[in-house]
Structure formats: C-alpha cells, structure tokens
Swiss-Prot record:
Gene encoding the protein: alaS
Protein name as it appears in the record: Alanine--tRNA ligase
Record region (Disordered): 853-872
Binding site for Zn(2+): H573, H577, C676, H680
Class of the enzyme per the UniProt entry, highest EC level: ligase
Bilayer-crossing regions: none
Amino acid sequence: MQTAEIRRRWLDFFERKEHTVVPSASLVSSDPSLMFTVAGMVPFIPYLTAQVPAPYKRATSVQKCLRTLDIDEVGKTTRHGTFFQMNGNFSFGDYFKREAVAFAWELLTTPEADGGLGFDPERLWTTVYLDDDEAFQLWREVGMPAERIQRRGKADNYWNTGQPGPGGPCSEIYFDRGPAYGAEGGPEADEDRYIEIWNLVFMQYQLSAVRTKVDFDVEGELPAKNIDTGMGLERVAFLKQGVDNMYEIDEVRPVLDKAAELSGRRYGAVHEDDVRMRVVADHVRSALMLIGDGVTPGNEGAGYVLRRLVRRAVRAMRLLGVEEPALPHLLPASMEVMSASYPQLRSDFERISAVAYAEEDAFRRTLVSGTAIFETAVAQTKAAGGSSLSGERAFALHDTYGFPIDLTLEMAAEAGVGVDEPGFRALMAEQVGRAKADAKAKKTGGVDLAIYRSTLEQLPAPVVFTGYEAAAGEARISVVLQGGVSTPSAPAGTDVEVVLDRTPFYAEGGGQLADHGTVTTTSGAVLAVSDVQQPVRGLYVHKGTVTSGELVAGDAVHAVVDAGRRRSISRAHTATHLVHQVVREHLGDTATQAGSQNAPGRMRFDYRSTAQVAGDVVRDIEAVVNERIHDDLEVSAAVMDRESALNSGAMALFGEKYGEKVRVVSIGEDWSKELCGGTHTLTSQQVGLVSIVSESSIGSGARRIEALVGADAFDFLTREHLLVNQLTEVVKARPEELPDRIGALLTRLGDAEKEIARLRGGQVLALAPTIAAKPVDKFGVRVVTHDAGPVSADDLRTLVLDVRSRLGEERPSVVAVAGVAKDRPVVVVATNAEARRWGVKAGELVRTAAKTLGGGGGGKDDLAQGGGQDPSKVPAALQGIEDFVGARVTGSV
C-alpha cells in the first residue's frame, strides 16, 4: 500500500467519523518555544490546553514534522530520520477513551478491500498505563486478548507537558513483525520486533507541581476531556510495504536509488555506503519540504538547520565518489513522489530547486578549499602526537573557509581525532559576542512564556482586538505584571506589562511594528505604551511606564493609540503589499515574500530569488509601485474561511500560522490579495510615495528591498535633489553628466594614487643597500631588521628578497622587514639556506612576530609573511625576531 494511499484512507476514515480534516500546518512552528513542528499535536496545542476555544469538536490531520535532535544518528540506524508525517485524530471535549479505542481498532483491522489498513488482529499488541483499568477493559471489549495487553508505568504510558496543565495516561498499539526480528514477549521484551504504530493519549487530568516526567501531582479531573493520537505514517508505510525501514518506502527509496545510480554503488553491499545513501535520502526529502515551507539557508535558526541538511547530503554524495552537483538529480526524484500528497511542491519547484542548487554550489566550493586545509590540520596534529584539533584550528576552518563546527566535528570523528570544542566556542564568543536571544524572548524581556500562558488561563476570555475599527476605546485592566509577576497595582515611575480585556493597540506581528500610545484610568493614572506583544495567542501585553498616578488591576481605562504612528505604519504595510505584487509581476510568481518589516515611514521586504536584480529592473519596480499608488486603488479587508480565501487567489505566506478563519486584504479588488492581519490605508493613494533606497542579497536564495514611504520618501528625494544640485556646482556639470564626470575624476585619482605608491615603493627599495649594510650578529647568524613605515606588502617582499641576495649565502642570514599597509602592520621574513641549516626558519619567526602584533601568519621556511592589528607594536615585533634567532641558535627554544 502506497504512503499516499495510507494517508488518504486515514483522512477518509475520520472524515466519515465526523472529524474536520485540517490541512498540515507549516514545518516552521508558530509556537515561539519551538523552532519546528515536532509532533502532530503541535498545531492543536492552544485547543488541547484550553488557551483558546477549538473551532471544531473533532479534527484529523496528517502533519508534516521535523526533528533534528538525533541528526548524527540518521543513516546509522533504521529508526532515525529528520522529516516525518504524523497522522492524528483529536477530540476537544467530545468523545473520549471508548471511541478512541474503537476507532483505532476499526481502522487498523478493517480489510484493505473494505477501506481499512488491513493489519492482522492476531499480530497487534497494546500497552496501557499501570492503573488504567478502563483502557484495559475497552481493549478487551474490541477483541484484544488480555495476554496481548501490557501495563506500563509513567515513563512509558503517561503524558504531560512538563509543566502544570492537562495530562493523562496513554495507550500504545504495536505490530508484531515476527520471530525473525527478535524475542517473544510483547513490547516489554523487544521493541525491534514489536513496532509501535499508534499512540492514544487520554487527556483527563489537571496536573500540578510537575517536577519531572514521572513525578507530578494530580489536582483532579478536567471538566472537558480531550483525545490526542499520533500514528507515524512512514512507520505504517514500511510495515504495509513489506520493507524493513522507512528509508525503503515509496516516498524515500527513489532518492536512495538515485544516489546509488549516481555513485555506481549498490545499496546493501557496504555498510558505510548504505549509511551515506540513507543520509542522502533522508536529508534531501527534509530539505525539499523545508524549502517548500519557505525556509531558506542561513546561519541561524531554521535556516541553519536547512543549510546543515543540504551540506550533509552533499558531503555524503562526495564520500560516495560523486564530484559533480548531485541535487539536480536527487531533488526532482523526491519531488515526484512527495508531490502526490503535496501538489504545491510541483508548482513551486522552480523556486525550491533554485534555492537548493545555489546552496549546493556554494558548499561545493567550500568543501574543495576547506577539506584540504582540514586534512592538513589533521595530519599536522597527528604528526605532533596530538589527538585533538585545537580550538584555533576549528575556528579558522569556520571563519576562513565556512566550515560549520558540526561538519568539523563530524569529519574529525571520521579521521579519528577530537576537537577542542570549548576552545572553539570561546573564540566564537569573542568574535560575535553574546548570541542573539530568540526574538520572542527578547520582546518579552526574557520572561518565561509559562507566565503568559498562566495569565491567559486566568482570563474569562481571550483579549478582544478592536483596532481595525477604531484607534481608541474603553477597556478594563485585567492584569498588571511587574518583572513577570502579577501585582495588584503599580505606582508612577514603574515599568509594567498590562493586559486589558479589549484593546485598540496592534501587537507586533506579521512584520508590522506595534502601536504606541496611552492608557488612562478614570482616576487619572497614565501608562505610556511603548510596545505591544502577543507572546501567546489571545493575550495582548502592553509594555510601558506608569507616568502618573497608580495603575490598579480592575480599573476602567481609556486606551488611545498614537494615530500618527499608526497611519505611518499602515502606509508602510500597504506599500509592502504593493511592492510584493509588482516584484512578482517583474520577476515571476516564485519571487514570493520571505519576510518584512513595516515601521513608521519605512518598509523592508524580503523575497525569494537566486538571481541578481538589475538596477533598471529595480527602478521599473519603483515606478510601477508609484503608478499603482496614484491609481487610487481601493484597499479592503474581509474575513472568510481559509479554504475559500486560498481558492480566491489570496497569497498565504510560508511559515505563517493561519486559523480556520482568515483576514484577506485586497488592493484594487483582485490585483493584490494576501492573507494579512495588519493595518492598512483605505486607498493606495494614501500611501503617498515609495522610494526604494536599496536592493541587495541577504543570503543564498533571498534578497531584500528597503524603501521609504510617504513623507519620509518625500524628504529623502528632497535631500537627494539638493545633493545633486551641490554636486553639479562642485564638478561644473549638468545633472545628467555627473556619472561620467565623477567617474573620470575617480579614474584620475586612482592613477595618481598608483603613481604615489610607485614612487614610495622606489624609495623603499632604494634603501636595500643601506639596510643590508647593518646586520646584527646573533651567535653567528646575521640578522637584519628594518621598520619601513607606510608601504605595500608587495614592496616589503621585494625589499626583503633584495636584501637577502645582497647578504649572500656564505654565512647564515635572516632578513625581517615590517611596515604598515592599509593601516595594519605587516612583517615579511626571509632566510638563506645556511640559516635554515642552523635551524632558523622564516615561518617560525613570522609567527613569533605576528603574535606580538596581535595577528597571525605563516609561510615556508625560506620566506613567510604575517600581520596583525597594532602598528605600534612593530618595533617590539622586530626585536622579538632578533631575540628568537639568538634563542634558536643557542638551543634555549
């Protein structure tokens, strides 16, 4: 049975059981505590934990999931994978254990010919929680023999969130693969033979004081009990397809086979090759799905995970002997099978493939240069008797050659050496400072999100947003937080977070910055609002300072948004929609939005594109945007169900979380239509003007447009006009002649600088006879040092070689000349053959000097070069070379 068929049967079965079929959410989780959607229940957490009312009583889905915790084990075992799909059925206060057990048994054991999954009932086992007699009896009633029902403890069969909230026992269903796979005795005896295929979680208790997974207090029964189940689609697929693991199912095997074909290796012949092919098969599919959900390669967050997946796959192919680009062969193979369930992969494949291929090309260049450096470092480490690469080596690989530390660790393990990871981390910390905190955590001041979830649970209803209709309104203070702790009141001068029962303030989201304004109580206390966040869905947190009076929880207030700021941000947001549409018209439908920021008077629009955009195209985009502004198109918003919105042509942004009801913002009826929760102008003409100030690449497959909007754009153009007028007066040219005139001036300036450098170099080289005439004797070695002052590195090398030749080969000689090139100190050292015979090497001397200069360097025994940061240390560096020569000759170093 094909994987897509299992998926279809699952959804059809539960739809017949009156479940709402919910499309898969994005792999990029909307939960700020998660990077990815790691389980089928993640999109339903707000409903399962009663943060917000569920829009349906019953739901079913096949959810895309990604886990990378055990990425290093992928391919080495047949259990580990990164991307997987989780079938789930959910009940929100509707049916409970009896129906959940009955549904599971019916779907599993109904013959394939009758629409079921056709598992042999005699090969099914279940586990229940130790004290869950009810679940035990329900399994007996559907026909499961008592001897195939095993009771297990909290560690295996009790679910909780890790914090106070809902929890309850669970029941797991296993399939017996037979004696060839292990010992008899059920799941407790051997989980290689008895494979878990379905987990039923019975959320029936309110837990308190959760200390660990197995140590918690049960406060009582939940008023409304929920069901959350999960079935691994790939796991069921390999059982139904008669193969041994997920790598061999129909949705994964084609990539594995293509890797074997490209490499000329046979899967199943050599264990190391099998591991690499499985890595390729898994990671290519994961990369396909991540890029499909809008992720682009980057150096942090989800982008870094994607980059790592692509690079691990590319490197695995190189280890299989494939030197040419492999993704153009592998990615289409994955798309062909995955598009049966996710048809958008086919329609979006031009964009997806462009992003993936660009990342492979970039990494292949990195591998070519970096691998040689890595192998040299390993050889030198082993030759010196070491067992671990230094932190400095690992850092150099990362900083200079683009090797991520995980790749260095992986390659080092394969080469049989360790890595000084703490040393690497320390150097990284020095370079980049403290790592950026998660954006949500920064916005909430580092306060634990559990505090906000608890605050929301205490409210009688989620906060109502009224800001679409009005920029002011009456409300009441529900909660006052100070330092993450609820307080009954807050005096003047206090920084607080305030929750109102309703608010006109827009919380930062969807690329739009938060509203500012004031909240005034009937007694005259005033909160100056400087930020508004929605840390958990349904909770608006107003951050600010009490400027007068005392805020008291429960007080009636008048909330007023800064209307000027709101209008300016709204103009920027509408401008972003205009730019998005025009970019797609000029660059194609694959140039979709990847991010944005809408601030007062300015906008930033990130979009997906692998090609550089010509300047005249950017100017055309700006011109068309302003044409649409002056067309005075109507801007309207309507709320509708998600499916209708998408069918109407509205664009949904990858990675965004949408509910069943969505807000659609349209410009000019059907000209631009996007799912959007932000605020906008009433017409395009109210935007005023858009002036694009930059268009640039921000990474592989992504570009950015930055623009000024409205009055800020007018001010910018006014300043530009004044600047042009000033330039025309200075260079005595008309505006249209400025580029040629300034270009000619720059050419003349460059020629003059070259001539000055030539003359200065001649002066430096003319010093060679004088410098060579003043050697210092260091225990029989002639040492010449000289500080040349401002000079080019090329002239330094020429001078050093000239002086060395003048000293001859009869006696051991060392020449060291330093200078300052482009504001940085440079040192060049040369030795003759006799000096090298005495053990004096140029590379060793340069490293000594460079350390004094605060830098590094190296080279050959006869000629080496280094540099640093501090020009004032040049005399000390040269003296250090003299001293080191003496120490080397006398044997003290």
